């Protein structure tokens, strides 16, 4: 199975390797365990392993993990996503799970990967539970905030605008990560940003997610779903694609990166599953 996917393992780091897929070459970090946590990023250039590290480092060694950098992010090479849709991205993730012979897993996703998660759950590999961290909803992605604003979100956006997106994000990484990890995160993101700046006009960084992608989603009632979100978004998620008869909302935090501020709660939940 692994040879079919053209896995290339690094001699120096047997847990990190690249997988050639139809959407591009993906950098993967993998550790075997009695149960496997699959972690998928939202938007942005941050490498997925480091993004979820505040959770991973709180888990016992018996729990394994799989993190995947999508094309043009983290450690994955540059590859235009022109002509590639969400279904193609889902299929690439599914092929990696199959290639590693993962028969069941816990899925932990942030932001935009929530939409990917709902499609991935329909694939024939058992998902024990979905942990969705402020997953993207159709309501928020296509909302007209001039008609129905979130005062709390508007306040956050004002704060980001005042200090600048990079300074805002750097403030969060500084209080979350040890100095060496934070330095590596910014080194990788800046390197990737420079590579992307050199691409020709029309280069597409990420897959487009359409309203039709949301319309085709369905969530089975037998899958336990845990949604971590800020308190002001509670109603949005109760009315969302992520709500079934087994959904539980866990409220907390005051920014979008709850995998950092709420990592203790998330790790405790994973240990219990």
Regions found by a protein language model. Give the residues of each.
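Conserved HGGG/HGGXW glycine-rich cap/lid loop of the alpha/beta-hydrolase fold
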Residues: 27-75
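Conserved catalytic-core motifs of eukaryotic protein kinase domains, centered on the activation segment
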Residues: 49-51, 76-81, 142-143
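Conserved hydrolase catalytic core segment
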Residues: 103-141
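Catalytic histidine-centered segment of alpha/beta-hydrolase-like enzymes
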Residues: 254-263
